[in-house]
A protein has these predicted regions:
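Amphipathic alpha-helical packing segments from all-alpha helical-bundle domains
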Residues: 95, 117-156, 181, 185
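DNA major-groove recognition helix of helix-turn-helix
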Residues: 23, 59, 66, 70
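Solvent-exposed, amphipathic alpha-helical segments
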Residues: 22-34, 76, 80, 84, ...
């Protein structure tokens, strides 16, 4: 079966949707309970009340499940702000930075003990989506300069800043912790650092 046929079947068959929804719900609950590294496929199938053969019809392993989960959640975050239907403007870039900061913060708050492996997998998935969105924006410009470099630089900058924000609870003397910077203020300070890499490439025709 071709990928397009499989995609069409999944869209039409409510049983496929229901089973995938059960898997995603079970996986989300397990991420909050025990963290990605400790989760096994058996844990997911037990919680979703399906057998392993059914799981493998949807995902090859737990890594593919994590990739799909993060991709879909972040896609909804982008679509909620209609950024996928926009072109480059400083305000749209600001909304994108805000979306990534909020998404990573929520992910770190909701997932138990996010270790390095989990962090790396999430980073790779989200960076691909940021890069695709920035490339889409830049492709609408009149610049003849290849867009790969500015899109890559901006992608790393956005993710790095959002990661810093989501982890920025700094230890103080006596074990107390500082709160994260106020998000709106943080984004306003971060925006020029990212925009400087894009402005010259993003002029509209």
């Amino acid at each position: 079966m071709s990928p397009n046929s499989k995609e069409l079947e999944e869209k039409l068959d409510p049983r496929v949707k229901r089973t995938r929804s059960l898997i995603l719900q079970a996986f989300g609950a397990l991420l909050a309970e025990k963290g990605f590294e400790a989760i096994s496929v058996q844990d997911v199938t037990d919680k979703a009340e399906i057998n392993r053969a059914t799981f493998y019809k949807h995902f090859v392993d737990k890594y593919a499940l994590l990739d799909y989960t993060i991709k879909e959640l972040f896609k909804k975050e982008i679509e909620k702000r209609t950024l996928d239907a926009c072109h480059y403007t400083p305000e749209n870039l600001r909304s994108l930075i805000l979306a990534v900061c909020e998404f990573l913060s929520r992910l770190h708050n909701e997932c138990a003990q996010p270790h390095q492996q989990f962090e790396s997998l999430v980073e790779g998935t989200i960076k691909k989506q940021i890069f695709a969105l920035l490339s889409h924006w830049l492709e609408q410009s009149k610049s003849r300069i290849p867009i790969e470099i500015p899109a890559t630089v901006a992608t790393w900058a956005i993710y790095g800043l959002a990661s810093f924000y989501s982890h920025s609870t700094l230890a103080r003397a006596g074990g107390a912790r500082e709160k994260r910077p106020v998000l709106e203020k943080f984004v306003e300070e971060a925006l020029p650092l990212v925009a400087v890499n894009l402005e010259q490439f993003a002029q509209r025709v």
